[in-house]
Amino acid sequence: ALANVQLNLQSAFRNCFEKSRKRQNGFPKFKSAKHSRKAYTTNNQKGTVAIIGNAIKLPKIGKVKAVIHRRPDADWIIKSATVSQDGDGKYYVSVLFEFARNITPVPISDNAVGLDYASDGLYVDDKGNTGTNHKYYRESHKKLAKEQRRLSRMKGSKKGETKSGNYIKQLRKVNKIHRHISNQRLDNLHKISAEIANQYDVVCVESLDMKAMSNKGFGNGKATMDNGYGLFLNML
């Protein structure tokens, strides 16, 4: 785990001083323990990381009960595991495997489609078809606002105040709603992007600055961010 931290630091400095990059990154910033991302990566060394039944084995921790999302095949080799804690207090382990697989070439055709951004749905293609996309943030907005008001009245909401136990519990409730909205959006975008990728060989899209479009000056920042079009393009 410590070796991976050192490698991440080395990579951050290399990206900072590398002049050949089109967009140069800034100098690495110190992250305090209070505001750091609660995650670490550990390497598998002689079986220190393993999936055993309904548990996962981690260095210095041992076996921990887990919900296994996907069972690995017998010939898969575990390389590393990343343990992270979400804002709602849940822990996740992402395991990196190495395995050999024969890739069958896919026949190339001229099946192509053009997509354009649509604020009401998700996209409009060159045939006039629109993508189905729910406004997940707006659907949960009232519930989220109610829990956020409760959070703002608790001890610890003001700067410099010590966060009380009730504040931390309420903060997890707010983060749980945010996670629910995010999971809904991700699931929908994964399904739509996979359907398009399987149906077409070439997908043409317009290069848009989504950050600029979500600016308050346009008056549709919330709708743009709730749309998730930029994430949809990354998935494609």
Predicted regions and their residues:
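Positively charged, helix-rich recognition surfaces that bind polyanionic ligands
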Residues: 74, 87-236
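Acidic carboxylate diad motif detector
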Residues: 1-87, 222, 226
